[in-house]
Amino acid sequence: MSEPTANLQPASRTPLLDRVNSPEDLKRLGRDQLPQLAAELREEIVRVCSVGGLHLASSLGATDLIVALHYVLHSPRDRILFDVGHQAYAHKMLTGRRHLMHTVKKEGGLSGFTKVSESEHDAITVGHASTSLANALGMALARDALGQDYKVAAVIGDGSLTGGMALAALNTIGDLGRRMLIVLNDNEMSISENVGAINRFMRGLQVQKWFQEGEEAGKKAVQAVSKPLANLMSRAKSSTRHFFDPASVNPFAAMGVRYVGPVDGHNVQELVWLIERLVDLDGPTILHVVTKKGKGLSYAEADPIKWHGPGKFDPATGESVPSNAYSWSSAFGDAVTELARLDPRTFVITPAMREGSGLVRYSQVHPHRYLDVGIAEDVAVTTAAGMALQGMRPIVAIYSTFLQRAYDQVLHDVAIENLNVTFAIDRGGIVGADGATHNGVFDLSYLRSIPNVGIGLPKDAAELRGMLKYAQEHAGPFAIRYPRGNVERVPEGTWPELRWGTWERLQDGDDVVILAGGKALEYALKAARDLPGVGVVNARFVKPLDQGMLREVATKARALVTVEDNTVVGGFGSAVLEALSALGLRTPVRVLGIPDAFQDHATVESVHARAGIDAPAIRTVLAELGVDVPLEV
């Protein structure tokens, strides 16, 4: 008998997944193997996400659905679109990127969302919600116009479906009647709890049994399937709920879109059976699947909000790596909760970002002065306008990247009448791992272009509080912009007095003066440390500028350096140049900011270094301007 081998490799925990590097490999598996493959995908997703900062719960919930879609459709010929794209980790693994999953959201690695330039299997570049249906319609129209015959399937979550863009696209889809499959992935949650009438309708579908009631058109639609879907309940497992198409009660059918569901989104074999029969039907079809966010991971199923995008954790126990950090979002949430006790006119509105914007406690303490409008940034802003017209002091809590979606409402509904609306703009500047779709580097530029809108960049939590208090006491719209990241906590009751449009000197020096606010001010102070003759000004107001201090420093200094965590096109540096021109001053100015190009995912520090706005880069510029400075910081 031979001796046992001492170094036998342990059996793979993912034997089926190890055989799948493409959708064609997937199709070689038997249908009875698909549940095991989905389980292996989930195990791999948990392992990948345990390093922190990745979208865990949504990817676990969508795994069975993604397996079924790729088993039936032929990507990349057929187009599979994912709304938002953060649930598509299984899609990435099934399309040849499993070996790169450890690079997700890392510099030079895979995107955390789908991205056209990353893979031929990624139909759209995405990161914002509610865009998939309009994209799918465009692809279906292009297919028909060019006489082609590929299939189009869009996966959209119930949270994304609350967005006006998705509903408007659905209305047009029903009107045009082009062949496409819309998979409504109903996990009862986006990042925050879903709200609105459409959400209530879908919740009702899950607790009531609806049946086809005899409309002739509905019967024909059912009979178009090889096995009548009218018999679906008798042949499907108990997890498959029901089918109906009564236009009188179903808003999807009322729009002209065939509706099937709700069905169990974790019965992968049943999903395959349905998709095979629905994807070739004439006209648009919605397949409503009910999934569990965090599926297969008990602690993620129990708290999907916490596990939407967790930090580092132990996959076996779910224990997180502890953090005592205090975020800018938390600083805002604490400040506005206290402010609402002081001023009964305070009312906070957010577009589906309660947790991310630090508003959980506020929503609990002041539930009657809090509104989540869902993924509807335009509605949030115009609702605030209506409140301001009636004497309230609304605060719109919103990420910078999402405020872009409400530019017209800021201009048309708020600014023209100079209404008292405060915009608490979180994630201003580079956000890092989420990349180009989420970087908030355009807000200073587009808000500067709107008359009446003031813009503030607090340097710390105290200044944030001072700006919030000022906004509640003075007239006109005011945008307070702060970065992603951590800040030092300040005591409750801290409300420093701020004078409108004023800057402050933080370091004396009249040879070269650095003007910066917000996150960029940290770099400016570090760069100028122990450099005689180099001044630093906290340019905490981007609009209006402090004309008096600007004239003073520009008259004395050999040169000015502006630093901003915003695009150089039309931002703070541009504002300074415009002001100097109006003042008739010719002081040389070096404008440092984010280049006129989209910035891919990387750490915030890496992007800032690449953009040339971190402390070493500023010191290099100072040296070029003749300052005697060592380049090491």
UniProtKB/Swiss-Prot annotation:
Keywords: Isoprene biosynthesis, Magnesium, Metal-binding, Thiamine biosynthesis, Thiamine pyrophosphate, Transferase. One of its GO terms (biological process) is terpenoid biosynthetic process. Residues 1-12 have a biased composition (Polar residues). One of its GO terms (molecular function) is thiamine pyrophosphate binding. Mg(2+) binds at D158, N187. Pfam families: DXP_synthase_N (PF13292), Transket_pyr (PF02779), Transketolase_C (PF02780). Its cofactor is Mg(2+); thiamine diphosphate. Residues 1-21 are annotated as: Disordered. Belongs to the transketolase family. DXPS subfamily. This is 1-deoxy-D-xylulose-5-phosphate synthase. It comes from Deinococcus geothermalis (strain DSM 11300 / CIP 105573 / AG-3a).
